[in-house]
Amino acid sequence: IKNMISLMPTSFPKKLLKNQEIYPAKGKKIARVALLTGCVQKEISPQINESTIRLLNRHGVEVVVPKKIRCCGSLNHHLGKNEDAHSDFTNNIKTWYEEHKKGNLDAILSNTSGCGTTLKDYGFIFRWDDDLKKKAKKIEQI
């Protein structure tokens, strides 16, 4: 742990974007996507999410970052905190499902590899829960 602590930054980058749910497209809107910002990345390297949002906006993509999305759940899952992980998974599935019904998402994007991998497993994780499995499969198809 001592070696890992030495790798931690002594200060964190300043966040440049406002904490909002909708980042509108510049010019003609051609798509609407949700972005999973990641619980660690948005604190350690917020410039990655900020650059992603600016790039998408510049190319006519509206970006939705739902405030209800806390974490993809993989961190809790890897730490063995299964109840917390399942709470994160369930929250995300329901939030994105409702967001899609509300305004038709063209995609759910993650620029964090661990989160992206976890999202693809939601349907499998809830294979015994018909309602969540159906919603998770819909989310996977977006």
Task: Write out the residue ranges for each language-model feature.
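Iron-sulfur cluster-binding electron-transfer modules in prokaryotic oxidoreductases
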Residues: 1-142
